[in-house]
A protein has these predicted regions:
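Catalytic grooves of carbohydrate-active enzymes
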Residues: 222-258
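His/Asp/Glu-enriched short active-site or ligand-binding loop at hydrolase and phosphoryl-transfer sites
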Residues: 176, 181-220, 252-261
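Active-site environment of divalent metal-dependent phosphoester hydrolases
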Residues: 85-88, 113, 136-137, 176-179, ...
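Active-site beta->alpha N-cap acidic-glycine motif
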Residues: 52-142, 146, 150-159, 164-167, ...
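N-terminal pre-catalytic segment of deacetylase/amide-hydrolase enzymes
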Residues: 1-79, 85-91, 98, 114, ...
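Divalent metal-coordination and catalytic microenvironments
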Residues: 81, 96, 129, 170-173, ...
């Protein structure tokens, strides 16, 4: 697997060694202090507060549709992080298809490798498939070369395995980032997508429950929300149809990430 990824990385090196060195050195001017994304919930359905250590907008990074939020436009974005399969993704896709709702699935290369048919189905049914790196790495801990390999390698593998291009969006694994990693991601042609709404749904042995998920959405949904969910969650799979129905009943529509500006 590593040799295959290294070959993918090499195919992206179309510039000279001299230019490569200059490019690598350029990122040394950016802080690589590791930050972990956080947000502050608003009980009144207002926009979430967020980590403002870095102005992420300078790097084509988003956590909220700011335009929709300012206009109080009832639009939300569903996103799912997919590190591995736990038997619920096709159920999620069935619900999204039934409700005619788009989503973005952030996948690792290992997820694609083990679930090619599901990854193809995501694209065939009109969803976006974003980048979650090859091995779900902590990006600030990696060298420039390793980041390029992880990001471009995942995108290349998506195309080779499914025949579909990966959409130009990346979610940093574990929400860990720095000014340096945001700059590199931007220069690789990807927009970084954080989130303004999430909950503890990723531990398959400690699920929050269907009622909790429905109640959480009822309490904290807001205009322009980018919602983080995990595909491995039985609670998400069980609650999703009701969550969508409730939001539609309040006049919300579900948008694709390409609407972000």
């Amino acid at each position: 697997m590593f040799d295959q990824c290294r070959k993918v990385f090499c195919r992206y090196q179309t510039y000279s060694i001299e230019n490569h060195v200059k490019e690598k050195e350029a990122y040394q001017n950016y802080s690589n202090t590791k930050l972990s994304w956080w947000f502050r919930r608003d009980m009144n359905h207002g926009p979430s507060g967020c980590d403002d250590t870095i102005d992420i907008s300078e790097y084509d990074a988003y956590y909220l549709d700011q335009t929709a939020s300012k206009k109080n436009e009832k639009v939300v974005y569903l996103t799912f992080d997919c590190g591995y399969e736990n038997g619920y993704t096709e159920q999620i896709l069935d619900i999204l298809k039934k409700e005619d709702v788009p989503a973005c699935f952030f996948v690792t290369q290992t997820y694609i490798r083990d679930n090619v048919a599901i990854a193809k189905r995501m694209k065939e049914e009109g969803h976006q498939v974003g980048n979650h790196t090859i091995y779900h790495i902590c990006m600030p801990d990696k060298s420039y070369e390793e980041i390029v390999q992880e990001v471009n390698g995942c995108a290349e593998y998506m195309k080779e395995a499914t025949g579909y291009a990966m959409d130009p969006y990346l979610r940093p694994p574990c929400g860990e980032y720095s000014a340096r990693t945001l700059a590199i991601t931007q220069d690789l042609g990807f927009k970084t997508i954080f989130w303004s709404m999430a909950y503890m749904d990723f531990d398959v042995n400690n699920q929050p429950g269907v009622d909790f998920v429905i109640d959480h959405f009822n309490k904290y949904h807001h205009s322009g929300a980018i919602i983080l969910m995990h595909n491995v969650s039985s609670s998400n799979a069980g609650a999703l149809e009701k969550v969508i129905a409730n939001l539609k009943a309040e006049g919300y529509r579900f948008a694709s990430l390409n609407e972000l500006q």
